[in-house]
């Protein structure tokens, strides 16, 4: 097995087998830093004889969107390639995006989180570093769906859709044919309708989502100042006496639903993938299950 360990912006000590290749990259790797990964994939599989993405999409059935499956390229590999990412969920998202765009998701993928991680919870990874490293190096592959958006970004642990200003959302969010959010913003600062959070599942259909009833994150994390505007009018002043800003990240458990795709539309939406916000607002976004599954190494 060819083993590449990508250590992202960290000097954490790693006990690795002698055959491992260690890549030290930025906390959020650049495309240039990941070229060695592209080269390793090309050596492991110089030619992919399996159906292309276009050919899979043209298939009349949807078998490829059922239970996640082992990569069909496995029997054709010169040597299996295992990639282990040591870093944050955001770092893993960048590596996944690179693998997805270059179409070598057949590579085995392990993850060793260096801080609190939604990915680790989703995949059932150990909470201590040494155990997580051991799993990443030696555990078998258990495929999971890969969720991406229409901007070509892969989601490692979670994503959110909210108002660009971080206030209540104006817009609509739909999971398959189920409406999770349909709302026009008001001036509330407490519990309200702020958007939705979604996480990839480890099985079909692929996406779990729920309505956000408080800001998806603290305004400071988006480079926004906290809202210090004084309430306008007697009604707004009266409401302010009986409400307070809601703690970020609260979800409405009664709205939890699953599906293969999430679509959203609104005047100024903020899209956040694994804690990293898009640089500018959009008026529509779609998250959906990719045609190839992730070959995840997990317990």
Task: Tell me the role of every PLM-derived stretch.
Residues 249-299:
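Extended, charged low-complexity segments
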Residues 11-13, 163, 294-296:
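Short, acidic Gly/Pro/Ser/Thr-rich loop/turn segments
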Residues 4-9, 17, 28-36, 42-79, ...:
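Catalytic core of DAGKc-family lipid kinases
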Residues 13-21:
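Short, aromatic/basic amphipathic alpha-helical patches
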């Amino acid at each position: 097995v060819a083993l590449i360990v990508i250590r992202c912006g960290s000097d954490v000590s790693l006990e690795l087998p002698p055959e491992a290749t260690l890549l030290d990259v930025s906390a959020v790797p650049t495309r240039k830093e990941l070229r060695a990964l592209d080269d390793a994939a090309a050596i492991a599989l110089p030619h992919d004889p399996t159906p292309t993405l276009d050919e899979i999409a043209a298939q009349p059935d949807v078998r490829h969107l059922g239970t996640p499956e082992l990569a069909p390229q496995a029997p054709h590999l010169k040597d299996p390639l295992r990639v282990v990412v040591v870093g944050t969920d955001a770092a893993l998202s960048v590596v996944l995006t690179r693998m997805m765009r270059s179409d070598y998701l057949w590579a085995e993928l392990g993850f060793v989180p260096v801080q609190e991680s939604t990915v680790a919870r989703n995949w059932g990874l150990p909470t201590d570093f040494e155990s997580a490293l051991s799993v990443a190096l030696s555990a078998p592959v258990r495929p999971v769906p890969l969720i991406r958006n229409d901007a070509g970004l892969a989601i490692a642990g979670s994503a959110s859709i909210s108002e660009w200003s971080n206030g209540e959302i104006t817009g609509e969010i739909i999971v398959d044919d189920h409406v999770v959010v349909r709302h026009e913003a008001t001036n509330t600062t407490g519990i309200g309708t702020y958007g939705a959070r979604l996480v990839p599942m480890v099985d079909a259909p692929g996406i779990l989502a729920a309505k956000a009833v408080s800001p998806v994150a603290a305004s400071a994390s988006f480079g926004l100042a906290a809202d210090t505007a004084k309430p306008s009018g007697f009604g707004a002043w009266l409401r302010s006496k009986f409400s307070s800003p809601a703690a970020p990240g609260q979800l409405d458990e009664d709205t939890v639903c699953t599906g293969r795709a999430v679509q959203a539309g609104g005047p100024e939406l903020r899209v956040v993938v694994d804690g990293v916000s898009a640089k500018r607002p959009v008026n529509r976004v779609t998250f959906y299950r990719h045609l190839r599954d992730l070959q995840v190494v997990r317990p």
